[in-house]
Design a protein with these regions (language model features):
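Conserved cytosolic headpiece of P-type ATPases
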Residues: 1-203
Length: 203
């Protein structure tokens, strides 16, 4: 799978492993995750993903999809997932609700971006949405929450903890509208003053 090992000690550790316990079929054999729950800001609890979501959940999936670099290709053998498993999980859920990544990219073009890195634990894009420059930030809730100025953070924190306790990988999604795109996009000028829109949980 062209995996890169960050710490050399991991090679020795993996070599001595005799039993691996995995959460579900596909995580190890296919490097694939599945989106199972979403929470929208203003709701009291998360909802399960069924493949036919309401307007609020679809908006969250659409927004999160725009801030993804992965893709889902349909082949005679089935879906071919390209990219990070957390991103393709979002894209597959969006596709089940009629939102194809390529069509989203065409309708809401990406104008700028800050790629994900392990220090920030965030990814940010600027897309043209409904005639506005929409900044979309996705990443770990504990990092993103400190950059949010609007939204029900108390409930979001509780939901994040509940999802995490059920072994879900949780990503938060937040946005803001800007008048002009900075000549040099940085974390300081894009990843602050955000409105929390929701959480996505996958396994």
């Amino acid at each position: 799978e062209n995996a890169i090992i960050r710490h050399l000690q991991a090679v020795e550790g993996l070599g001595s492993v005799s039993v691996i316990c995995s959460d579900k079929t596909g995580t190890l054999t296919q490097n694939r995750m599945t989106l199972t729950q979403v929470w929208m800001d203003g709701a009291s609890a998360p909802v399960d993903i069924t493949g036919r979501e309401d307007a609020a959940a679809c908006k969250l999936l659409r927004t999160a999809s725009l801030c993804c670099d992965g893709s889902v290709e349909v082949t005679p053998e089935g879906e071919k997932l390209l990219g990070d498993p957390t991103e393709t999980a979002i894209l597959v859920a969006a596709r089940k609700n009629g939102m194809e990544k390529k069509a989203l990219n065409d309708e809401f073009p990406r104008l700028a971006e800050l790629p994900f890195d392990s220090d920030r634990k965030l990814m940010t894009t600027v897309n043209r949405v409904d005639g506005q420059n929409l900044v979309i930030v996705k990443g770990a809730f504990d990092v993103l929450s400190s950059r949010v100025i609007a939204g029900d953070l108390e409930t979001a924190r509780r939901v994040n903890d509940e999802m995490s306790s059920r072994a879900l990988r949780v990503l938060a999604v937040a946005t803001k509208v800007i008048d002009e795109i900075p000549a040099e996009p940085t974390s300081e000028n894009l990843e602050s003053g955000l409105q929390l829109i929701g959480l996505v949980g996958m396994i």
